[in-house]
Amino acid sequence: MRFKPLLMEVFTIPHQGQHILYFPFRHTVLLGNAALANLVGQANRGDVSAVQRLRETLGDKCDDIAVDEPGEHHLCVRQQPGPFKPTRVSLFLTEDCTLRCRYCYAHGGKSRETMPWDMVTGVIDRIFDNAAAAGRKTMAVNFHGGDPGAVWPLFVRARDYLRDREGSLGIHVTTSVGTNGVLDQAQRLWLTQNIDSATLSVDGPPAIHDSHRILPDGSPSSGLVMKTMEHFDQVKFRYGIRSTITAETVSRMEEIAHFLCSNSAAKRIQMEPMFPRGRAAGSDSRAPEAQEFVDNFRKARKVAAGFGRTLSYSGARLDVLTNVFCKACGDSAVVTPSGDITSCYEVADAKDPLAQVFFFGRYDSETRSFAVDEQRRARLFGLPVLDKPRCQDCFCKWHCAGDCPAKVLHAEGASTQDLPDRCLINRELTRDQLVAALGKD
């Protein structure tokens, strides 16, 4: 039996007077005392006698943490970039929006720039070409913005164009949309008949929702959004809910969870703390305190579980073993209304300072092709967690993978905190998942 420092990486986490011993590459969680924690540490450093003592102490359980062959785990390792030939794309059809959310991470609706039709078809054609060249029978298109509802005729026309190309090439397109739910009944019916899935933004009871998510004239949006959610449920449409939590609403997360579970059939609800970017940075809305978010998330999670639902948060995902937080680290293809290619949904404005990091090309209307800055794209592939010194001893390392790169870079540019608030949230909620894995929740 051999213990390899990388493949047998172990994290020791204090818990109620004992220690959680976590072996991410072995999908193993043990609970032990300080002596056992020290013994595992010695074994992991190559102490042969410690290995034998572990065998005597743990018996068969020792096999769970032993690694006999290198590469025996399923870590999603980011490779060097190959040619840019995406078979999935996110189309930001417009910067316009049918809401003026006070905490918007962008400035939705401030600009009405909309993607020209020849760009819509050109990008779609390139994705089909890439799928055909790769011998794929499927590809994926996500519609985003702004909000597609602000340019509804273009949204419908783009979906119709996809369907025409599907029929002629025999390549199936999976479609999804991020929507604020501000739709009329005809739009709701069309969406559920023509789009495969959606993420719907709802912040909870009307009074909470309408405190931040308002129409351009300042009036409430909850009436329209609730009707959209009701229609989704009536036709058994596949969708998830995303709720943004602010300092003003964090103490009501339990209530929000109960409302959403009582009024929606969505199986998965995601709650995220507001982040001060875009319009949010200049508004009265404030991000919640990290510990307060954690405490109230735990209450809301119990409510959701009682309804048979899953409450999630992006930085706590024990079921994901990876060295990158998301596809923004090189794999993503998001085309903005102006034709820029960004890897990050949250960085879609060329004037954003982070555009220098996440923008890596443009759609060329003359050649109807992608012009890519390979040096910038290669730098995106240099964002994995292994390149982040502050993460190396953290037990969340292979799950949050250094956290959302846009938020991390924004925080690093705005603050010198050693422990950003999201790190605290990530650690506490991931610790909860480890405790649950021990059966001691």
Regions found by a protein language model. Give the residues of each.
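Flexible mid-to-C-terminal extensions adjoining Fe-S/redox cofactors in radical SAM and related proteins
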Residues: 3-7, 348-441
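Canonical Radical SAM [4Fe-4S] cluster-binding loop centered on the CxxxCxxC motif
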Residues: 83-84, 88-119
